[in-house]
Amino acid sequence: MSAAEVADHYNNVRQAGIQDRKESRIFFMRNMNNWIKSQLINDAMKLVNENGVKSPVVLDIACGKGGDLRKWDITGAKHVVMADVADVSIQQAEERYKTMHKYPHDIFGAQFIVADCTKENLDDKIEIKEPFDLVSCQFAMHYSFVDEDSARTFLKNAVGKLKLGGVFIGTLPDADRIVWAVRNGTEGKFANDVCKITYEKVDELSEGNVPLFGAKFHFSLDEQVNCPEFLAYFSLVKHLLEEHDMELLFVHNFAEAITNWLVPGRRLLESMKGLETFPNRNLSGKTDEEYLEAKAKIDSLGDNVPKFVGTLSKSEWEAICMYLVFGFRKKKTTEKNLESEAPEIKKVTPVPLNEDTDKTAEKNEERIEEKEENPSHC
């Protein structure tokens, strides 16, 4: 799968209007994803502020149509570089940025770059000379894991110009969870009412045969067929980033992230409509099985408590649990405990969703260690 094919796919995706988004089967899931990104950026900004920076210089790599531009404005960013392989997406991002000049306050400076970050040196195209305080890559890094060279080039572009103490955040499909799901499906497939995951080479699903690079799968969401994607095992991502003096601050599966951020972010979650009210007459899911957990919660409430809860349908929840959220920081030159600077975010590993998923992760750790002993790159 070439970068040109990825670009063509995203260039041809129809820009959905507000009404289309409201009528989508995954309306609440998309809003939840957006809320998770907001909480992630908010926590990252705390770390950036602790590094002595109030108005960060930001790289939004694989930025798509610029869906996070408003978030960068809220952070008080000084300058944002938006880079993506799809030229139409960059054009739409730039148009979105231009509308922000109508805001009653000054907004950040920006540069929009069309670049294949898996092949080109992004630094050659960046106009500003300042290093980045914050880098963000949302739902896109895994495309670079088509092969080792592409992944290494992408990660170098992502963090190569990050200042000491700078932060790299992102969201990523959980490769171990996906492998578990398709292994336990039929003929390499997992499907529910909102998503379908297909692993191309079923014979590779036997233990230990899924490659570290080039493991192709297809993820269709809400009847929209996506272009082929590639598994990016988080343990491998961590290993490659450590070569760039990056250290892991945190990694959570989305279910864990929602639990961690629910209390501090509840008001924003409600305003962003990240949860569906149950019960109501127009539920997005059409079967009772989609809301068994919500119904059980309602039944457990006392008689004097309002009988409404916020929820996601079962299918949306299963899809959202296929993702991870992460944060890294570029090591400083001084020897000190960097984690002590960020009490708000604990360094954790994802809670295993089941024993098989955990075993898959452990197996991949072993394979990465073997690769390190016999490196293909000097």
Curated annotation (Swiss-Prot):
Residues 335-347, 356-378 have a biased composition (Basic and acidic residues). Residues 24-331 form the mRNA cap 0 methyltransferase domain. Keywords: Methyltransferase, mRNA capping, mRNA processing, Nucleus, RNA-binding, S-adenosyl-L-methionine, Transferase. S-adenosyl-L-methionine binds at K37, A62, D84, D116, Q138, Y143. GO terms for cellular component: nucleus. It is found in: Nucleus. It catalyses: a 5'-end (5'-triphosphoguanosine)-ribonucleoside in mRNA + S-adenosyl-L-methionine = a 5'-end (N(7)-methyl 5'-triphosphoguanosine)-ribonucleoside in mRNA + S-adenosyl-L-homocysteine. InterPro entries: mRNA_G-N7_MeTrfase_dom, mRNA_G-N7_MeTrfase_euk, RG7MT1, SAM-dependent_MTases_sf. One of its GO terms (biological process) is 7-methylguanosine mRNA capping. MRNA binds at N33, N34. Residues 335-378 are annotated as: Disordered. One of its GO terms (molecular function) is RNA binding. The record marks K65, K71, R96, H142, E229, Y323 as: mRNA cap binding. It is an enzyme of class 2 (transferase). Its EC number is 2.1.1.56. Gene3D superfamilies: Vaccinia Virus protein VP39 (3.40.50.150). Pfam families: mRNA_G-N7_MeTrfase. PROSITE patterns: RNA_CAP0_MT. The keyword Transferase applies. Belongs to the class I-like SAM-binding methyltransferase superfamily. mRNA cap 0 methyltransferase family. PANTHER family: MRNA CAP GUANINE-N7 METHYLTRANSFERASE (PTHR12189:SF2), MRNA GUANINE-7- METHYLTRANSFERASE (PTHR12189). mRNA-capping methyltransferase that methylates the N7 position of the added guanosine to the 5'-cap structure of mRNAs. Binds RNA containing 5'-terminal GpppC. This is mRNA cap guanine-N(7) methyltransferase. It comes from Caenorhabditis briggsae.
